[in-house]
Amino acid sequence: PELISKISSFGLGDYSLNQAGVAAAIASYNDEKFLRYSKEKIVEARDMLLDAVKENGLKPLTTSTNFMFVDLGSLNAEAFRKEMEKEKVLVRGIYQDYVNWSRVSTGKIADVKQYIKALPKVLDKIS
């Protein structure tokens, strides 16, 4: 109880927000240079993904986010997910009734390159 009281004294408000965590969040929010860098990398990665998806005959949904949905045509999204996982690439499998749609996040450029490398191999395997 004494230790819990001591630790609790560093919280903020009813939600027990940690002061150090709040300070870090505010600093991150105000770091405009990092925000610009992050946005640039998201756009770069998204463009790489869009090109790769189209080059492999798939149809991406238009997006302005850090992820995209890809229409796999007649291919099953869960089979695609499992094969991509074997290639050390994590993507979203089937979501609700969308059995032929895959969701991929931008991630780091190295991760995007891994997706691009694995994509044709996996498509050949499950086609």
Model feature map: region roles:
Residues 82-87, 96-127:
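PLP-dependent enzyme catalytic core of the Aspartate aminotransferase-like
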Residues 63-65, 70, 95-98, 111:
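Conserved alpha/beta core of the MobA/IspD/sugar-nucleotide pyrophosphorylase nucleotidyltransferase superfamily
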Residues 42-47, 51-87, 106:
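Conserved PLP-binding catalytic core of the aspartate aminotransferase-like
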